[in-house]
Amino acid sequence: MGLGTVHPDSDTLKEDVESIISLGLRGVKLHPDFQRFKIDDYRCLKIYELCEGRLPVLLHCGDHRFDFSNPNRLRPILEIFTGLDVIGAHFGGWSVWQEAEDMLSEFSNFSVDTSSSLYALSPEKAKEIIRRFGASRVMFATDYPMWSIREELARIDSISLTADEREAILYKNAAKRFGFSL
């Protein structure tokens, strides 16, 4: 299972998204910090429009060092594109956790993944977020693996989840969201 990427400056965005679909990829990954655009940049509106109701969008979110990917920038996007399925990488806001929680609280079409975040987010805080917003809104490692799977699984296990929560986070949520069978 993979995701494709596009850039808002492309002159062929519609064709780019159609290529992602025709290749059998299951969503679009955007990294505002590396690709040098803000989540709410007007140039991204066409991407969100093309993906709404068709492809989940995995967004690099957070990092207090940059303003491109602050989860607060999602607010107008999630208000406009209510059918857009947005996954905030790094628990929705690496190093700006409260902003991610605000988005989870306000928008049912926003969920998070665990990649490259559980080393910095305490197991207690991760568990609090999972219990507050539901395990159905958390997915394991849909983004780039900074650490080994073994290390990431150990971090998941340190959260003391129920068996149902663990299964949902590790694979059931991704299977449902990205449309593959178990």
Segment roles from a protein language model:
Residues 1-46, 110-111, 150, 177:
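Mid-domain alpha/beta scaffold segments of enzyme catalytic cores
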Residues 7-10, 63-64, 93, 145-146:
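Short glycine-enriched loops at secondary-structure junctions
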Residues 15-19, 23, 135-139, 150-182:
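Mid-to-C-terminal alpha-helical segments outside catalytic/metal-binding sites
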Residues 20, 28, 51, 90, ...:
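Conserved, mostly hydrophobic/aromatic
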Residues 26-27, 37-139:
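Catalytic pocket-lining loop regions of alpha/beta-barrel enzymes
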Residues 33, 63, 169:
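Residue-level "edge-of-site" marker
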Residues 34, 116, 144:
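Flexible, active-site-proximal loop/turn residues at the rims of small-molecule/cofactor binding pockets
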